[in-house]
């Protein structure tokens, strides 16, 4: 229900959101409205549909009758998830990382690119105005070597999801080793 509230906030502030995208990305406002801003509701609606079909506790052996006690697999939140997003198509990356993490019951710390923080600031406002409890979605701004490195090494962060350069992805992977974090990387770009 709270994540649906983010969609309500998006719908109320669509023009403002598209203008922020246009300013950050240098995209024409029509393109921001038609192609970039719709990423948030599209991904969110799809995650909400998928969420309804997740079997959070399921039998280890689904062929066994369910009327008898048996071992089960329980899906549980990982905990605190660090989300590091790139400068390009930032709203797409925020939606792909933050929405499923919150639906799974995780708390998030989002560090957007220092070159495109406006989308993340608006998303944080959407979360606040939608009634997401304090501490569930957190926003930190700053550069990769400073803030990104802190997220990657912090002992309370259980997982890092990073999209960006191969060089930075390597650094994040190495930094996360000491705390045995789960790491997901989408790499490309400039080295």
Please place each PLM-identified region on the residue numbering.
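Long amphipathic alpha-helix in the N-terminal Rossmann-like dinucleotide-binding domain
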Residues: 4-15, 29-55, 67-69
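Short linear capping/connector segments at secondary-structure termini
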Residues: 20-30, 34, 59-66
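Short alpha-helical
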Residues: 12, 16, 27, 39, ...
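Conserved small-residue-rich beta-alpha loop and adjacent elements
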Residues: 58-135, 158
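Conserved NAD(P)+-binding/catalytic subdomain of aldehyde/semialdehyde dehydrogenases
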Residues: 80, 129-191
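Short secondary-structure junction/hinge motifs that connect adjacent elements
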Residues: 1-6, 62
């Amino acid at each position: 229900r709270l994540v649906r509230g983010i969609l309500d906030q998006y719908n109320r502030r669509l023009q403002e959101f598209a203008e922020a995208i246009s300013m950050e990305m240098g995209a024409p406002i029509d393109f921001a409205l038609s192609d970039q801003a719709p990423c948030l509701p599209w991904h969110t609606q799809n995650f909400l549909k998928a969420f309804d079909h997740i079997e959070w506790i399921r039998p280890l052996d689904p062929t066994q009758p369910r009327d008898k006690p048996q071992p089960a697999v329980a899906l549980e939140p990982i905990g605190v998830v660090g989300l590091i997003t790139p400068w390009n198509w930032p709203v797409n990356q925020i939606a792909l990382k933050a929405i499923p993490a919150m639906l799974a019951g995780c708390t998030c710390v989002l560090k957007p690119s220092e070159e495109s923080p406006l989308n993340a600031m608006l998303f944080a406002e959407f979360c606040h105005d939608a009634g997401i409890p304090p501490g569930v979605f957190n926003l930190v701004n700053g550069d990769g070597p400073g803030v990104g490195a802190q997220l990657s090494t912090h002992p309370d962060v259980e997982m890092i999801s990073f999209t960006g350069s191969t060089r930075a992805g390597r650094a994040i992977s190495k930094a996360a080793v000491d705390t045995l974090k789960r790491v997901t990387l989408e790499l490309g770009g400039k080295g």
